[in-house]
A protein has these predicted regions:
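Active-site-adjacent bridging/hinge elements
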Residues: 20-39, 61-62
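Conserved phosphate/anionic-ligand binding catalytic regions in large, soluble enzymes, centered on
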Residues: 46-62
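C-terminal catalytic subdomain
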Residues: 61-190
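C-terminal amphipathic alpha-helical interaction region
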Residues: 156-255
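ABC transporter nucleotide-binding domains
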Residues: 17-18, 24-25, 200-202
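Short, small-residue-biased leader/transition segments that mark boundaries at the very start
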Residues: 2-6
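Conserved phosphate-binding loops in nucleotide/dinucleotide-binding enzymes
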Residues: 39-46
Length: 255
């Protein structure tokens, strides 16, 4: 019923505590009052690790696999496992910890409460909008952190799958070989042009068309070949264009 709409727990409202003339005790309502640096860390935790990267992965794969509601994707074994790994497995070792909220607890609640909530009318088509402007923050920051920490991001699998999924999405062909309309993106025409010649169900039609995109630090924040995952993303992409059901088969293979 209607009351379920208001059960959008968890709600994390984090506000900078700068009220020169005093303020009500917002903490009693569950609001986190803190300094600006901590507010920024909470935001970074969300957009680079615990929430936004998961949304983008669900958006591009949701379009390819025929979903119209993000919440429904969490009932999908492969997609729910993909975002679990992006957030809890690959994101956590390099997450920004704001101190006032546990990143693990936040990500767990995102996975089990927030995204599966059927009263959140998010569609993959809407969230896939402007993905070229988002991947640098949503994936690039974690990739850069791995390079800084381990010298390479080659240990990653779920994040390369998400990026390969975006590249596959750019073909505008679903996993059954049917065309779909790409969501609005300022780079849409340029990106489609870079994929020129790549054809669904013809893996041999791929002759390196992704190299310019995957090496573009303006998009990802880092050259993905220098990060050690460019070749892996190309290989995943080729598997995902192999024919009907190839995207599903690729997800099953690597998750």
């Amino acid at each position: 019923g209607l009351e379920d709409v208001y059960k959008r727990q968890p709600q994390y409202l984090v506000i900078e505590d700068r009220f020169p003339n005093g303020r009500p005790q917002l903490e009693k309502a569950g609001v986190y009052m803190t300094d600006r640096d901590t507010v920024n860390k909470v935001e970074r935790m969300k957009v680079t690790t615990c929430l936004n990267p998961l949304h983008t992965a669900l958006a591009v794969y949701g379009c390819i696999l025929g979903y119209n509601l993000i919440a429904d994707e969490m009932k999908d074994k492969e997609l729910s496992e993909l975002v679990r790994r992006i957030g809890l497995v690959e994101g956590m070792p390099v997450v920004t910890d704001p101190g006032i909220i546990s990143p693990e607890k936040f990500a767990d609640e995102v996975l089990h409460v927030r995204i599966p909530n059927p009263f959140m009318p998010d569609t993959p088509q809407r969230i896939a909008t402007d993905t070229s402007q988002k991947v640098g923050i949503r994936y690039g920051e974690t990739i850069k952190a791995y390079v800084e920490k381990e010298g390479s991001a080659e240990s990653l699998t779920a994040i390369p799958l998400a990026i390969a999924g975006w590249c596959r999405y750019l073909l505008g062909v679903d996993d059954n070989g049917e065309s779909f309309e790409l969501s609005a993106d300022p780079m849409a025409e340029e990106l489609k042009a870079q994929l020129d010649g790549v054809r669904f169900a013809e893996p041999s039609s791929y002759t390196g068309q992704l190299k310019n995109l995957l090496s573009n630090a303006n998009i990802f924040g880092i050259n993905l070949y220098e990060a050690g995952i460019g070749d892996k993303i190309e290989e995943l992409f080729v598997e995902e264009i192999a024919g009907k059901g190839a995207v599903r088969a690729t997800l099953k293979k690597y998750l």
